[in-house]
Amino acid sequence: MARTPKPERRALLTDPRDRHRAILETAARLICEKGYEGTSIHDIAEAAGLTKAGLYHHIRSKEHLLLEIQNYGMDVFEEKVLSHVLPIADPLQRLKECMERNVLLVTQGWSKEVTIILHEHATLTGEARAQINARKKRYVRFLETSLAEAIRTGQIRPVNTKVAAFAFLGMVLWIYKWFRPEGAIPAERLASEMQDLFFAGLETRARGGGKRGGKGKKA
């Protein structure tokens, strides 16, 4: 008896609007579980409910699929984080909102794409790697620029903006390694506490008060 396709497979085969996105998400899940080298085109096609020939109708190659996954992850990040924080005029508030949205992005269903951007970027070669690196560098520049603005306005103390930007990224991008949705810390509380920890080390005493990093208080 033929196996009944899983609901996600049926949706993948019948809804052309979501088909490509579903392939990317299926491939992202497999690559997170098995690594890029350990995931074959056959694995992806089977998980997506397609033949290899059917899969190649949607992708050029395995490496190009990896590029598309990373671009998809960056697209999601820009939609759910950057598009909301770029219009914020106050640089400190912009940074705080950026951290909160970053944390929620990683903890609420997009950790696969973050994992692949972090761990599989070196697998890409040539123009593909340059394209992803350019997008990542734009985000680092955004953080450095926002930090520099906050220094100029006296909201945070003078610091090396590159060091601060990468410290910011180090905090938020590696959450997926240890955060568990079913654990004792809800995602919203985690975002608040990480804001307290990070910005308590940056804000001037005039803004931060005598004691920094109040327990559980949202920045």
Language-model regions: role of each:
Residues 1-18, 206-219:
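N-terminal intrinsically disordered/low-complexity leader segments
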Residues 22, 26-64, 68:
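Helix-turn-helix
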Residues 36-37, 156, 185:
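Conserved hydrophobic residue
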Residues 68, 82-112, 165-168:
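Hydrophobic alpha-helical connector segments
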Residues 75-78, 116, 126-152, 162-166, ...:
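Amphipathic alpha-helical packing segments from all-alpha helical-bundle domains
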Residues 84, 100-108, 116-123, 197-201:
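Helix-loop "lid/cap" segments that line or gate small-molecule binding pockets
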Residues 94, 107-127, 144, 177:
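Amphipathic alpha-helical segments used for helix-helix packing
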Residues 157-177, 189-200:
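Hydrophobic alpha-helical segments that form the core
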